[in-house]
Amino acid sequence: MTLVDWFLDTIALLLGLLHIWIARHFQHWEEKGVHHVAPQPLVGSMLRLLTFSVSPAVFIQGVHEAAGSHPYIGFYIFGRPALLVRDPSLLQHILVKDFSNFTDRLTSSNKHKDPVGAANLFCIKGNRWRQIRACITHTFSTARLKIMFSRVLNSASVTRDYILERGNQPINVKDLFVRTSLDSMCSTLFGIESSTLYNSEAQFLHYGHKMMRWTPYRALEALAHFFSPELLNVFDTRLFECESTEFLINAFSEAITEREKTGLYCSDLVDSLIQLKKQLIDVSEHEVLGQAMLFFAAGFETTSSAMAFAMYELALHPEIQDRLRTEIQEVTACHGGQVTYEGVKKMSYLDMVVSEVLRKYPPMSFIDRVCLHDYHIPGTDVVIEKGTPIFVSLLGLHRDSIFYPDPEDFNPERFNKEKKSGVHPFSYIPFGDGPRNCIGLRLGLMSVKLVIIMLLQSLRVETHESTPVPLQLSPYVLFLKNLGRLPLMFVPIGEDNVETSLA
């Protein structure tokens, strides 16, 4: 046998072994009789993500749509079988009823290379997650939200004044509400004045944008963190961008240290982090700062995008805007002309509008869990093996015509009492559900509602000739946000409404 023959035989053998490996791994769902996305060699179902053709949000939505009328669908993360669930009843089992078997997320970071990123509530697993979440949960209790209310309302009123000062010119609400939510979040959760609304060069704004900037390399990092944690042992990657992490860690460390020195109690996240250090004597500095980083990152994008999407839809639907403004005026009139915590809770149409915004534009486009023990899907013969990743496309679920007819239409009436009662509750989960839902959802909702209230009291929001219709979502980000600028017009509706008092 010549060297060439030996080489060709070796190649043939390797290709044969590769074919056997691929066939064995990619027959998992077929052998179970589960409807699945046809895999491709080596990459499984991940080709569109690997070629940057779509964002993770659109990728998972595509898997959801491929399920058709099936309650779930299998796919492959490279050679690893994964399952996407679209049936609300099964989701209720996974997220709530059988939560003990699905407590962990797949999302991870390498604790040796990225100790802060790996230590946040989104990534930590098992009993440690329970311990830290229990210490942080009271940050968002009703009592504390009432204290935070005035801070959030003040930030919303400053935003209104900023718009009024700009006069008759279009405002890019995408940028505006990033600054608004950043100032509100820093003040409300950390006791820090970030001063970004009037200062485009503010450091918190600069590093916030840097943290969320989406590049091809960051896309690959996201692929590892959210879909294939095994790759974290190969690549030197971080959940949060390095330079912004360094700046924010220093800022949050200073805030915590200063609060510990003064003993000042502000009923915010900093107080909860100090309490965390006292309650868990073995808690690390990385775990404390990891929570601060998580809340900053989550609040920076999700809340601001919800505000921008809300204003965009209200500009496109003036009849909805007028009805909402009327409700705001009537409720505030019953509360002495003031915007109060109790008054906001009585604004039922506002709640319907915000619910529809979050249906059409869910803050998190998908959620994930990991099956901790073999799990028999109720009512079937299918068993999900231990270690199988489970995904839910919130974007796909909320825009599924089976649950929401004409899903691209903006229609708050979907959430009136009559229609809401006729829809499975787990077909609408913008913040997830169960014990591992979004811990800050009540603060996020309050922030969005107060901005809407303060702006609609004084201003009419309208489209501009440069406003994109229809809206294009960015294919390059993890959280939902529009592609490019989002200019809208704000027209004062009368001086009598501008001076509404705060409470």
From Swiss-Prot:
Its cofactor is heme. Heme binds at residue 438. This is Cytochrome P450 6l1. GO terms for cellular component: endoplasmic reticulum membrane. Keywords: Endoplasmic reticulum, Heme, Iron, Membrane, Metal-binding, Microsome, Monooxygenase, Oxidoreductase. Its EC number is 1.14.-.-. The gene is CYP6L1. It is found in: Endoplasmic reticulum membrane; Microsome membrane. Belongs to the cytochrome P450 family. It comes from Blattella germanica. It is a peripheral membrane protein. InterPro entries: Cyt_P450 (IPR001128), Cyt_P450_CS (IPR017972), Cyt_P450_E_grp-I (IPR002401), Cyt_P450_sf (IPR036396), Insect_CytP450_Detox (IPR050476). GO terms for molecular function: heme binding; iron ion binding; monooxygenase activity; oxidoreductase activity, acting on paired donors, with incorporation or reduction of molecular oxygen. Detected only in testes and accessory glands of male adults.
